[in-house]
Amino acid sequence: MDFTQPKPATALCGVVSADGKIAYPPGVKEITDKITTDEMIKRLKMVVKTFMDMDQDSEDEKQQYLPLALHLASEFFLRNPNKDVRLLVACCLADIFRIYAPEAPYTSHDKLKDIFLFITRQLKGLEDTKSPQFNRYFYLLENLAWVKSYNICFELEDCNEIFIQLFRTLFSVINNSHNKKVQMHMLDLMSSIIMEGDGVTQELLDSILINLIPAHKNLNKQSFDLAKVLLKRTVQTIEACIANFFNQVLVLGRSSVSDLSEHVFDLIQELFAIDPHLLLSVMPQLEFKLKSNDGEERLAVVRLLAKLFGSKDSDLATQNRPLWQCFLGRFNDIHVPVRLESVKFASHCLMNHPDLAKDLTEYLKVRSHDPEEAIRHDVIVTIITAAKRDLALVNDQLLGFVRERTLDKRWRVRKEAMMGLAQLYKKYCLHGEAGKEAAEKVSWIKDKLLHIYYQNSIDDKLLVEKIFAQYLVPHNLETEERMKCLYYLYASLDPNAVKALNEMWKCQNMLRSHVRELLDLHKQPTSEANCSAMFGKLMTIAKNLPDPGKAQDFVKKFNQVLGDDEKLRSQLELLISPTCSCKQADICVREIARKLANPKQPTNPFLEMVKFLLERIAPVHIDSEAISALVKLMNKSIEGTADDEEEGVSPDSAIRSGLELLKVLSFTHPTSFHSAETYESLLQCLRMEDDKVAEAAIQIFRNTGHKIETDLPQIRSTLIPILHQKAKRGTPHQAKQAVHCIHAIFSNKEVQLAQIFEPLSRSLNADVPEQLITPLVSLGHISMLAPDQFASPMKSVVANFIVKDLLMNDRSTGEKNGKLWSPDEEVSPEVLAKVQAIKLLVRWLLGMKNNQSKSANSTLRLLSAMLVSEGDLTEQKRISKSDMSRLRLAAGSAIMKLAQEPCYHEIITPEQFQLCALVINDECYQVRQIFAQKLHKALVKLLLPLEYMAIFALCAKDPVKERRAHARQCLLKNISIRREYIKQNPMATEKLLSLLPEYVVPYMIHLLAHDPDFTRSQDVDQLRDIKECLWFMLEVLMTKNENNSHAFMKKMAENIKLTRDAQSPDEAKTNEKLYTVCDVALCVINSKSALCNADSPKDPVLPMKFFTQPEKDFSNDKSYISEETRVLLLTGKPKPTGVLGTVNKPLSATGRKPYVRSAGTETGSNINASSELSPSAGNRSREQSSEASETGVSENEENPVRIISVTPVKSIDTVKNKEINSDQSTQGNISSDRGKKRIVTAAGAENIQQKPDEKADESGPPAPSKPRRGRRPKSESQGNATKNDDLSKPVSKGRKRAAGSQESLEAGNAKAPKLQDGAKKAVPAERQIDLQR
């Protein structure tokens, strides 16, 4: 730096001594520009020492050295190029300010400004603590701070420039090598300026705040700490300045006031962390910003407040409730990123402020249903993260939100929810990290996770399997620990979870068998048939992997590798071998994965897919050692030495569930059971009093004991007498399993079964029915398993005892308690024996598999008579209503069982099929429920002919929502299975008539044409009932127009009109009813589909059993329903009576007064008009109803006997032109719900028989009593199966509709399907998102 040549010293200072000389301290020579720098430094040091030793009281010295003081402030010194000179001069000047305080010796404002700027520049020397001059710099700082020298600058007009320079200098030099004294003096210096001045300018405030910005904070943490302490110290003074700054930027939008305007939110966060009082006036401004119209601005404020509210020591939420409530409102913001940020904040808030969980719960609930997948996902992450930190942080409601999301429509959300719950279960239940109370809180997780196995998605199933192997029962545990974990898990699962787990093992075992069959195909010579079989097997395997489309390619590639690599094949064979241990399986999986890995390809989707396959088929849990450990655990439970109570399971429950577990594993891992020790333990179980335990033990022997006879003769000799005893005197279930066990594991089965058959068949005594049940079960199963040996002897038993003695006689009188159903334990032994007798007849026939002796015809006539007589075969009116329900169910189920055998299906007449079908409309809820479940079970396994699927159309008449919902689920499942089967099996095209779901239409039309409630083909009310039943089926079939199926179904209905009813081809009325149903079907199809008018791809084939061949030159263009009727059917004009008139069929059942119809409507009521409305049956959640359809869980419990009466309901207004909402059916509002607004009695209420002396409905005059309808002539229906029938006696037909008391409930509550053309727009759902204004 260039300096001007200094003038003589006298001129430099302006004030000299009396003789014109500057007075220097003793020993100090004159300091001028003539001397060398070193000499100058030497002399200045002596001056510094002199001023350092002076104090304010030395008036003479002060006066003496005043010229020197002025001299040191000359330009020569202030601009000296030598830093040591400048430092010494600065020290002198600082002491001069101290000595002469409070008045400075310098009067010129410009000079003062130059001096303080000079001193400030020298303070930069504080930066280097290792400098030899550091102590002198420190002395300078200390002196300035102690004297508060800079306060002199307040008198200067532009003092702000000095202060800004000072603050910037101090913040820039502070570093981690400085001790606390340096920082303290800096703080003293700066705080005195802030607190004693008139205010802090924006530029000065910026010099402080800039150190809080993250970028600066990261560069120099010491400057951040200095600023932080400074702000804390001066909070009272500086708060107003800070408020003004934020007010300018946030409210007035004047970002130009400061270069820090763009960092306002960062500054607010830091200032809040330093001291919330700094922002007392700023927080209301943030509330204003939260309501900004700019989404990005709201997002920035939400991010800021999330940090402020969520920080650990923050009490902002309690101190500023309005701001907190305003912030919570952003959870419902219209801007997706704002909602997302709000949800992310919740995790920190839950962890740091558990007391705010209650406020957050409701908002998280809404966001857990957010339309944005990412937000739903983050809700789960938020809750799970907090729960993993401490389970006490989340309440049951929050965990419930995660539970709900396991059924989310998006895979990513479902996966996060499932994995999160699995981690919580492992942490708190398996490891018990927070004690028993926490474990109890999340004990439901295991059941919920396994329930997800019921979902259709293969991804869900695979994830459940992974969770089971890693979290519920970790496969990497030692065998004993792993089996203990499984043993007590199985004992504590709910029934649905147990079924899911069993299904999981079954699916894995099935996949193992597919892979085994694939490897067997590799061993065979190459041929076209072999290649075709291999391709089919590969497609089956691919269906069991994620993304089946891609999986097909990968499985084909894997198959090629298997074909080329024999060693890989041997590894895979070992993996699926029944003798493979868990440790071997782990080695095999790793070895196969290593061989297929490609080091050059870090992400290998092919390898990932193969790993999925290997994980599913590898026996990672169960081997011989594991079974042995399970058996030992069960033995400990039997001996009472196990930890059952500690694990929260009673010993009896542990034994029973342990044996059930072993029973399930005996299906999937039979080889692992083959040891004397295991079988000895099972023999011990056989001797236990618990019937369920013994039954399970027998079944395990049946599944696993194939080598007992040859390898373990001692076990064999002990087992045989026990099996004989169980077959003769055990429970019915034990008897069945014992017979099957003997048949499965012994070579001399004929001798063994004969030793059971002969004494049992001789000792049958109908007078002691309680001793009949087990013998009947055993005899039935023996005749089914060994028909060649026992079919003939059984014929005489059937003719002389079963039919003549047991079924055709009523020895006891049933209770007349009015109940239509009783629990199993209350059913009379005689009825139980009759039910088993019916089952025996079926098993006997199923064993023979032929009708050479015409026994099947006789049996079918007997079963038909049972249905026609409503279960009271003898018609002596001695049997109770609940017992009649049991026998109707048994008869209907028996016909359905026989229909599964082709030779018997052929001889079942249409009349008998119709009688069987009507059981699904029985008046007893449980009969309808159980029959529907049996029907579904057989159809879904493709065991029953397609015509039986038509029976589900009658479910439209069921008064209970649950039953209709179940029926619809069954239809969906059956139709999807049949379509999938046709796709997967090319050969199935030859059997399209029996497989294609659309072919159910002609069977349905024929069945409805013969509905006993369809008596008048032009009755609009009856036609509406028919339409409801048709649409119940057609709606499911018409969901998709696959292969132009709509036109195909229309063509079938049109073709039926060209035939005659094969059941009564010459009866004009019968044919007219058939053609009328066809026209109703055509009307429905035309109104629901615009695609049905296209040409059908093929001409449908009609079943010969139900329709005659079309006659030549026969045309039938006649419309059997008028245009007015057509409009009524489609527009849904309410009718005076409900669809349920069909369910509550007016039968004059035995033991009850004949049902009377009113003259005007033909749907009378026997319910008092002044009575109250009964509660409707509750509708289940989607999850429950879907599970019910899969698992057959009971949908109705027993109800106390009570008479429920209702008030007839007036017709509602016509509901027209609304769009049909297909989702209604999923919720249970199907078919007749779509057509009628139903008022349904509870399931128990409908099973209460009205007393005979109840008054008829007073709404209309009673019509004359009608005879019972529907029994066919004796020559057709009875034959030799009944004895002494009086044909003239009035009898009722086989269907008993749901109790007559419900008929008036439904009257007039119709809401028919709506026309699509004039569809009324649905009211949009209320929006959960807060539209920001």
Curated annotation (Swiss-Prot):
Record carries keyword Secreted: no
A GO BP annotation: mitotic sister chromatid cohesion
Disulfides per UniProt: none
UniProt biased composition (Polar residues): 1160-1179, 1222-1232
Sites bearing N-acetylmethionine, chain numbering: M1
Function (record text): Probable regulator of sister chromatid cohesion in mitosis which may stabilize cohesin complex association with chromatin. May couple sister chromatid cohesion during mitosis to DNA replication. Cohesion ensures that chromosome partitioning is accurate in both meiotic and mitotic cells and plays an important role in DNA repair.
Name of the molecule in the record: Sister chromatid cohesion protein PDS5 homolog A
